[in-house]
A protein has these predicted regions:
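Alpha-helical nucleic-acid-binding subdomain
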Residues: 1-160, 166-175, 191
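Conserved helicase motor core of SF1/SF2 NTP-dependent helicases
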Residues: 126, 146-159, 166-348, 352-373
């Protein structure tokens, strides 16, 4: 839903903020914040436990000097263990006293609210603060949480595969490397990034950051030769070799009655999976309100699983990772698809098709479709 709003009504400032948060410079600044600035939120005071007094200077020395290379939670744990040792409590009460000491130490933090701490960082970067945590901020919030409290669960596995890697930021990958210490494989297509433009330079920088090897998969198996070549013409470059599987030519219609044309195509393909792939939910609702046929179509939703339905509608975003026998892309107008991110959206939508692909425009066709002729 957030991406749907961004695609339909995102401002230039929205996209600039995303570009900043998906940059390696942002990651370096954030790592510096995690390793230095965030630690300064700890303001120790002299602690008294019965007859035992632990001076502020001693706590400060342990935290800021002796353990300065550790994350906050490990410093707090070490100081709490030190207090338990000094107090010489019976073993049966060690855990309770240790937890009490930890709680008192965390109370010496100016704040442990991860969003509030993240906003401190954003202010220092002269970026807008957040009120709600979005996909563009969740990795940073979790990294702050990990620094403060550690992870309370072992998430490791024998092998991890992460798909759609183009949708993740350098901060996400930094988080992944902290969570999983096993071998990992990241898969994706930089041309299917729908909220930012990526390049091979980005991949090289990412590989260097996470110490990974890049392997290019240069053969397309999903679509027919006709669809694959057409999709690559939308991009204006060749990105893969095609498997020798022929099919129908991609079809384009310019008509004022978009609904009627969709219904006609659907009627001719009742035994195949058909998906009407729209730019936004607004378009889906517009079509369903105008057609009793389309009103019966299942709408793909990221929050629910797909059924066995053969007739579907989806936004381009929710169609990612899914394939259909027949794809229909309505409102393929220039006013609807005109910038570089729109180009990527059209590419993503067209690559959902296995056998047949249809574009329908009711105004001047998109410039990216005109270039394919």
């Amino acid at each position: 839903r957030m991406l749907d709003r961004l695609i339909t009504s995102g401002t230039q400032k929205d996209f600039e903020n995303i570009a900043i948060k998906y940059s390696f410079e942002f990651l370096e600044d954030f790592k510096n914040f995690l390793n230095n600035d965030i630690c300064n939120l700890f303001m120790p005071k002299t602690m008294v436990f019965g007859n035992l007094i632990i001076e502020e200077a001693e706590i400060r020395d342990i935290y800021y000097n002796k353990l300065k290379n550790l994350p906050i939670y490990k410093r707090i744990e070490a100081i709490a263990e030190h207090i338990v040792d000094l107090f010489n409590v019976p073993p049966s009460k060690n855990i309770d006293f240790y937890n009490r000491a930890k709680k008192l130490l965390y109370n010496k933090m100016i704040t442990t609210d991860c969003v509030r701490i993240y906003n401190i960082f954003l202010r220092s970067m002269e970026l807008d603060e957040i009120e709600e945590v979005s996909a563009y901020d969740i990795a940073q919030i979790l990294l702050i949480k990990e620094n403060l409290f550690g992870f309370d669960h072992n998430y490791d596995a024998k092998y991890i595969v992460v798909d759609e890697m183009q949708d993740y930021s350098p901060c996400h990958f930094y988080l992944f490397e902290k969570i999983w210490h096993c071998p990992k494989m990241y898969l994706g297509d930089i041309n299917q990034s729908i909220d930012k433009n990526l390049s091979k330079d980005y991949l090289n920088m990412l590989a260097k950051e996470i110490k990974a090897k890049i392997c290019y998969l240069n053969k397309s198996y999903r679509s027919t030769i006709q669809i694959s070549k057409f999709s690559q013409k939308i991009l204006g470059k060749k990105v893969a070799n095609n498997v020798n599987r022929n099919g129908e030519e991609v079809k384009f219609y310019n008509t004022k009655d978009v609904v009627k044309k969709i219904e006609k195509i659907v009627k001719a393909h009742t035994n195949q999976t058909v998906c009407v792939v729209c730019k936004s939910m607004k378009e889906i609702k517009l079509l369903q309100n105008a057609s009793s046929v389309l009103k019966t179509f299942e709408v793909l939703d990221e929050e629910k699983e797909m059924t066995e339905s053969k007739m579907l509608m989806s936004t381009i975003i929710n169609s990612k990772g899914v394939e259909f026998d027949v794809v229909i892309i309505p409102f393929a107008n220039d006013e609807n698809y005109h910038n570089e991110l729109d180009r990527n959206l059209l590419y993503v939508a067209s690559t959902r098709a296995l056998h047949e692909l249809y574009f329908i425009a009711d105004k001047k066709p998109s410039r990216f479709l005109m270039k394919t002729k």
